[in-house]
A protein has these predicted regions:
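Trp- and S/T/G-rich repeat-edge/linker motifs of beta-rich repeat architectures
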Residues: 31-37, 74-77, 120-128, 161-169, ...
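Residue-level "micro-hotspots" composed of small/polar
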Residues: 23-58, 79-93, 129-130, 170-173, ...
Length: 846
């Protein structure tokens, strides 16, 4: 069966190629899949359903839980017997994003439930009489949510949060699928056949004549666009075009006769998921691609049985498999054709691709540093080194440079083994290393107008005279030459290491220095004259310079613009754009528009690091670049210049190592983390705060660059690279605004997807308004106490003073009395003495 399928893929490969080249959109023969499995955090590798919510998160329904993917982490939601607000059951059968109500509907093996984004919990629902729990949801064009289940159709009553009957007849058929076409007609797939219901007329309408014979045989259906119905019978699967009233049997030439799921990509082509992989049909219903599991190709599907297909808002295709978890194709990753290294058919024999040159028969010679010489014909079939080396008598595998001379003879520059000359019409190879007395390397090789072959490397610059048979290589200079280019009929330019650029007169063999560059310690890797009389000079340590023919620098491109200071290869396309392979991606420079587009692994490159002197343009305009892990080719007009959109969302908040959510009693989260615009923190919570976030761009997840600014702390934007979390410690009380924005390259920033989060940090209890009130009351109390104390003291002092004064007065009065009586007694004593004395004398004499 697989052999037959392969034949059909090959049969339609020409159609596929023409389609991809003419549309310039998806190159289906170059699609590569990435994978998410248990190793990345999935709870189960069987994926029954996939959808994307309003925020941009991708949801996976597995056999063991519900998962939310943000590009970095997989967040698992599982059933908990003790929690009625948890997921109803871990076996998920369908997912539906209700964009009108911002609700995720989940059909499980034990009934349905919905995920509430504001509270981050689940609500459970009952549909009376539903015996089978595979429920299909649909929002009609009128905004009515319908549920198709085992006993008919039900409508969601939003006010009462209940499902009520809709279009139920007495027989109550099992409705397996429900969809609305562009004419506001419902297509209803039931166990009793296919039906149609007009929402405008509010009545059932007859089926088109073409599909009436199949209605009772239909056992699976899917409306893959507003005008195309895919349905499966016992023997085949068909697509019915509603508008044109045409029917096509997609499986007539296939051994596969049924499908499980289907979706359309942004071009309108149909992806059909089957037990034997994915079949892609174009708008003419011709098979143009087949993807299945491959043990030899890691970028193929890792499992063939397909259970779900989904196209997200960015045109990425998500594939749910039975054993392989999630496979996904990133839109745009197909624009570069990859020629990988490996032992398999049509793989390069070497990993590090060095120089690539055009061959006489519209093919390419490809030099590798670790696998010898390869040849690519015009059908893009690779002849490996094992065969070529035997034919050409080549013994070395480390080939650094190639040159096809005027006679169509091939010259090879080798590492530490000089140069080889292969003469096709004689089938003879001349080894110039055997003719030389000095060890040399051919890092670059070129022919001048005088039939001289020049090659150079770390050990110097050498000359071979083709006119002389078995001519010994002549050492012209000890310069460490890494690049040679013909400037005019008699002048070569040589790029050297730590010696800048030198000019070589091919007649006089004189070598002179050219003071073009601002530094003399630059490692010149590539010199390229374009069609506008400009000389592009690449360095390995200081970016890219552009000179005019007079040697004046007219432009300079640095790491900030190119993503790397290491320039590996330069080539001009048919539109005068200059493509530059660097140590960190591929750049397209439009000097007229002043723009630079940079491409990385997120855009489909196999690796970001290109190799030296490895750029070539074929006569039809296709460009080839060598990397340290294989080779790529592309047509520049088909490469999309994309300024990706980001929608930054918070994915997790941690305070003092505790995860915060609306369901956490200690949390400060009033609603879903992803919907937060403002948070309030206590002093304790602000002591250690960690916020995780994602740009929700699944193409540039690994390369997304972030910048943030904390208004209230930062004056300028802080560029944090691909770090997708931020930590704060001991935030002082106050109000802040955290701003986060994203970019694919750190140069072009998407301001529209910026996230602003207002953060309010409450003061500690001893600095809170209540504390200040207490402090004020205490202060007033102290003032009052001081006042009372002072007043009491004053009164006491006054009383004491009064008592003292009274006592003094009494003492004074007593003293005055004593003095008075003393004076009186004195005054009385004197006369009495005068009276008594005579009396006493009288008495004595009596």
């Amino acid at each position: 069966m697989r052999t037959t399928l392969l034949k059909f893929v090959l049969l339609f490969s020409l159609v596929l190629l023409n389609t991809s080249l003419s549309t310039g959109q998806i190159q289906y023969n170059n699609i590569r899949f990435k994978q998410l499995s248990i190793a990345e955090g999935l709870p189960h590798n069987t994926i029954n359903a996939i959808t994307q919510d309003n925020h941009g998160f991708i949801w996976f329904g597995t056999r063991n839980g519900l998962c939310r993917y943000d590009g970095y982490n997989i967040n698992l939601f599982a059933h908990n017997e003790a929690d009625s607000t948890s997921l109803r059951h871990n076996f998920i059968t369908r997912l539906y994003n209700d964009s009108l109500r911002n609700i995720l509907w989940i059909s499980t093996d034990q009934g349905i439930c919905s995920y509430n984004y504001e509270t981050e919990d689940f609500s459970r629902y009952q549909i009376k009489g539903n015996t089978k729990d595979d429920v299909c949801f649909l929002n009609t064009s009128d905004g009515v949510l319908l549920a198709a289940c085992s006993n008919g159709l039900y409508r969601y009553n939003e006010q009462d949060s209940l499902f009520v009957p809709f279009l139920l007849d007495e027989e109550k058929p099992h409705v397996r699928y429900l969809a609305e076409d562009g004419d506001k007609t419902l297509w209803i797939d039931t166990n009793k056949g296919l039906m149609r219901y007009s929402l405008e007329k509010k009545q059932f309408v007859s089926l088109p004549t073409l599909i009436q014979p199949f209605t009772l045989q239909c056992n699976n259906a899917a409306l893959i666009s507003s005008n195309q119905l895919l349905f499966n019978t016992n023997n085949d699967f068909f697509v019915y075009h509603i508008q044109s009233n045409t029917l096509c049997n997609l499986s007539k030439d296939l051994e596969v006769k049924d499908f499980r799921c289907a979706a359309t990509d942004h071009t309108g082509n149909i992806w059909v998921g089957t037990e034997y992989g994915i079949f892609v049909f174009n708008k003419l219903y011709q098979l143009i691609a087949h993807y299945e599991q491959s043990e030899r190709d890691l970028s193929a599907l890792n499992d063939s049985p397909i259970y779900s297909l989904y196209q997200d808002k960015a045109h990425n295709m998500w594939v749910g498999t039975y054993f392989g978890g999630v496979n996904y194709y990133i839109f745009g990753s197909d624009q570069f054709q990859i020629y990988p290294y490996g032992a398999s058919f049509n793989h390069l024999s070497g990993k590090a691709v060095r120089q690539i040159i055009n061959a006489p028969d519209n093919g390419l010679y490809i030099a590798t540093e670790d696998g010898g010489l390869n040849y690519l014909n015009n059908k893009k079939e690779i002849t490996r080194a094992e065969r070529l080396h035997k034919q050409m008598q080549i013994y070395a595998k480390n080939i650094h440079s190639l040159w096809l001379d005027k006679d169509n003879s091939l010259w090879l520059g080798l590492f530490l083994k000089g140069a080889l000359h292969y003469i096709p019409h004689l089938n003879r190879t001349v080894d110039y290393n055997l003719l030389s007395d000095e060890v040399s390397s051919g890092f670059c090789i070129i022919e001048d107008k005088n039939d001289h072959i020049w090659y150079g490397g770390p050990s110097g610059l050498f000359l071979i005279d083709k006119k002389k048979a078995n001519s010994r290589p002549e050492k012209i200079s000890s310069l460490r030459v890494f690049n040679l280019v013909q400037f005019n009929d008699s002048i070569l330019w040589a790029g050297t290491r730590k010696g800048s650029i030198f000019q070589i007169n091919t007649h006089t063999l004189k070598v002179t220095s050219l003071p073009i560059l601002p530094h003399t310690d630059l490692y010149i890797t590539y010199i390229y004259p374009d069609s506008h009389q400009r000389i592009w000079i690449g360095t390995d340590n200081n970016g890219l310079y552009v000179s005019d023919r007079n040697g004046s620098i007219i432009a300079f491109y640095s790491k900030e613009q190119l993503g790397s200071n290491a320039i590996k290869g330069i080539i001009e396309d048919e539109m005068s754009n200059v493509w530059v392979g660097t140590g960190n991606g591929l750049c397209c420079i439009n000097s007229q528009a002043g723009s630079i587009d940079r491409y990385t692994t997120a855009d489909g490159l196999p690796i970001n690091q290109f190799n030296y002197s490895s750029a070539c343009k074929k006569p039809d305009g296709e460009l080839y670049f060598g990397t340290i892990n294989g080779m790529i080719s592309f047509y520049p007009e088909q490469v999309r210049s994309v300024n990706p959109r980001f929608n930054i969302a918070l994915t997790a908040i941690w305070s003092n190592s505790e995860y915060m959510s609306p369901n956490n009693e200690k949390a400060f989260i009033p609603s879903s983390i992803s919907e937060l615009t403002e948070i309030t923190l206590t002093h304790e919570q602000a002591q250690s705060l960690r916020l995780e976030y994602s740009g929700l761009n699944y193409q540039y997840t690994d390369n997304t660059q972030y910048a943030m600014k904390m208004e209230g702390i930062d004056k300028d934007w802080q560029f944090v690279g691909n770090q997708h979390q931020v930590r704060f410690s001991n935030l002082p009380s106050g109000r802040y605004i955290l701003k986060i924005k994203a970019s694919k390259d750190g140069i072009h920033w998407d301001e529209t997807g910026q996230k602003d989060l207002a953060i309010r940090v409450l003061p500690p209890w001893w600095l809170s308004p209540g504390a200040y009130l207490v402090y004020a009351l205490l202060f007033l109390l102290i003032i009052y106490a001081a006042y009372r104390y002072t007043k009491t003291r004053i009164i006491l002092l006054m009383r004491l003073k009064t008592e003292h004064e009274q006592r003094v007065n009494i003492e004074n009065m007593n003293q005055q009395k004593i003095n008075f009586f003393t004076y009186i007694s004195h005054d009385l004593k004197t006369p009495l003495t005068l009276i008594l004395s005579p009396l006493q004398l009288s008495l004595i004499h009596i």
